[in-house]
Amino acid sequence: MSVQPAQEGDTASFIHAARREQLVRCAIELIAEVGPAKASTVRIAERAGVSRGVLTYHFRDRAELIEQVVRSVYDLGLEFLGPRMAAAASPREALLTFIGGSVELYAAHPTEMAALSNIYSDKDGVPRAGHHRHTREMAELAAGLRAGQEQGQFRAFDVDVMCATVRGALDAALAHIAGGGSVEPYASELQTLFDIATTAPRGD
């Protein structure tokens, strides 16, 4: 039986997607090991077992590949945390889920986290503060904190300061995990800390 044109197109698209995924994976691994400055397109292609021409066929330049690495790690985080966040019954539960789940994510996917951290920390890399995925994550965190305040679950505090504090604590958690530390009791202690820091005082 002959392969129909539509089937041929589907096969080609699958192969193309699989090759891009392979190249992104190899880029993640190499950047995690040596940092973005030393992760040249030649070295990434060598790791994937292909020529540099194959890499540049799938990605117009190194910047596009690096951006795809960043996007891939955020997508992984969304896949890991998204269902849990969606199931949270309140802003308080969502905050604690985000904090605890993030620490678990760091432990479950150390290579991806190392790659993203190396990209953000490189002087010529992608600045985290201006990246749209980071900005969106922080905006969602801020929205959850404001919702908690409006519903009376959280006390009055500066949301921007609290967001920055949560992010800083999670950055420290990532360093803890990367250094060989365990998820617990670190995650639960962070949850307790921010639960106390945000919870509205109870009336008499």
Residue ranges: model-predicted function:
Residues 22, 30-64, 68:
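Helix-turn-helix
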